[in-house]
Amino acid sequence: MRLFAAATVALVLLLGQAAGEELAEERAGQAQGDAESTESSETTTDQAVSEPPITLVHVLNPGEREYLSPNLIGVQNIAMTFLPLSMNFVNIIDAFREITAGVRYEILLNALDTKAIQPAEADIVCRLVILEKPWLRTQWGDKHRELVTSNCTDPAVNSVAGDPAEKARLLNEKYVHRSRRSANDILGRHKPYDEEAAKAQLQKSLDKLTAGEGPHYKIVKVYSASRQVDSGILTRIDADLIDGSEEQHRCIVDIWTKVWVRKDEHEITFKCRNQPVVQARHTRSVEWAEKKTHKKHSHRFDKVDHLFYKFQVRFGRRYVSTAERQMRLRIFRQNLKTIEELNANEMGSAKYGITEFADMTSSEYKERTGLWQRDEAKATGGSAAVVPAYHGELPKEFDWRQKDAVTQVKNQGSCGSCWAFSVTGNIEGLYAVKTGELKEFSEQELLDCDTTDSACNGGLMDNAYKAIKDIGGLEYEAEYPYKAKKNQCHFNRTLSHVQVAGFVDLPKGNETAMQEWLLANGPISIGINANAMQFYRGGVSHPWKALCSKKNLDHGVLVVGYGVSDYPNFHKTLPYWIVKNSWGPRWGEQGYYRVYRGDNTCGVSEMATSAVLA
């Protein structure tokens, strides 16, 4: 009896080792193939080649379960051997093996039933339980394997579907003379797909996205559809869709289906004409989403949700949790009301809409500006500007950009350093007018070396002029690049290319004096109320004074020119200032802001200053 027990244990260990060696050989073969493909692309050398490492084979103990990679060809071959002929193999979902009275494989796979009456019923999940007896061989010399149970449907065994054992016996008899099928016979190209079935599948996916947090679309018309079976099911649909903005687009929709245990996962890509590509994913049922949102059987086509999703895609917003996303969505909704109010009360031609600041609170947005308030009780430290009188009529328009006196639009990032960009822009313009050379000077030097201002926590142009004078000048941007945070000052006086003797204050509230100074000297540093700039998209901005008070200056910018927009059909003329901002070229009009000229809109002439070069 002891001898029999010992023999049984030895047999079980032998089975585990044999199975482990088989899969180890396959994995090693794959690794060797990868290595050979890599070596083929490299130049050979005369160096000695080291011996390949010894592969350690894991021996399974009785009852121990080992999960197998779905990508192993051997596992796929086993599954395809016992899959009914009426079904096309798609991919392995899950697989494991264990030592029992042999090697027991349990494989969960995704397949297509080619005999399904309704296309929507073609996608199925099969679970196969297969017993391998390696001490037995088939007539072709392969290891003997037999099907234990299967929940796959097949017309030949439907009559015994309720009896798993009988069903397995019939399937074994059916496949006893069947050789392994090639994956090339199964995986095909795009084939035409029933349009009604495609429309139903698309509608189901859209319902899930609407119920969750995805984009929102409505189907208008389906033109054509196709399917491709690979390691999953790719359904491609050509259709007209209406998005959350109530705009109709011709779109190609790709639905990539992966079937998993107890839930399915779909990756959906919307490629609409003249629109950015939108990608989404859903992994839960409509019923689950309905319970979550408490909107059972009443999915609301929410325009705001759709706009918020497009905002996330365009500006790359990623939120750390669902709670944060919901908070940002609430802020976004409130900001849409502000945008609506700005558009309704706009007296110029400006359009306000969704910008990168659309999910920020007012306080968060203010952190992206950074201008301190002047203490009106104290002297600024600057001299009163002597504005040269312009002889003759002032030009209708003027732009220092056309005179090569304005550098490219810069981006201060998530740092309240507008004051530094306003000052360097002013000095860059003055230097270009004086020397004929347009150079970029360093804002980072001011963040690091100006001890009066507070780097990313804000500052004042008045202080920056004084700091440059005391420090000894400015280095070039390339020599002292911008980091959007305060670091240790490492100013190199030998690399100072421009020096400042002081600064001047232009007459407060006098926009004609600003024009004359601009024409004679160069761009002007100003402070402005940035309320209307948060959602500015273009046009001449002329908001109500109640929405943009001249007293609340919070942003430092640069006036580089002026002009006039004429609207003869409406008998309307809009004079404006051309303002260079520091939020990058994607904001506003390629980084610029046109604000109404003539009534001190948003305090444009309240804090106008300019450096005096040494």
Curated annotation (Swiss-Prot):
Entry keyword Disulfide bond: yes
Q: Where is the active site?
A: 418, 555, 581
Q: List the disulfide bonds.
A: 415-456, 449-489, 548-602
Family annotation (Gene3D superfamilies): 3.10.450.10, Cysteine proteinases
Pfam families xref list: Inhibitor_I29 (PF08246), Peptidase_C1 (PF00112)
- Gene Ontology CC: extracellular space; fusome; lysosome; perivitelline space
State which residues form the propeptide: 21-393
Stated EC number for the protein is: 3.4.22.41
Q: Where is this region: Disordered?
A: 25-50
Q: Which reaction does it catalyse?
A: The recombinant enzyme cleaves synthetic substrates with Phe and Leu (better than Val) in P2, with high specificity constant (kcat/Km) comparable to that of cathepsin L
GO BP, sorted A to Z = proteolysis involved in protein catabolic process
Please provide the record's keywords in A-Z order: Disulfide bond, Glycoprotein, Hydrolase, Protease, Signal, Thiol protease, Zymogen
Cleavable signal peptide: 1-20
What's a single GO MF annotation on this record?
cysteine-type endopeptidase activity
Q: Give me the stretches of Low complexity compositional bias.
A: 29-45
- Glycosylation site list: 151, 492, 510
Indicate the family of this protein. Belongs to the peptidase C1 family.
Provide the function of this protein: May have a role in autophagic cell death.
Q: Name the chain's protein.
A: Cathepsin F
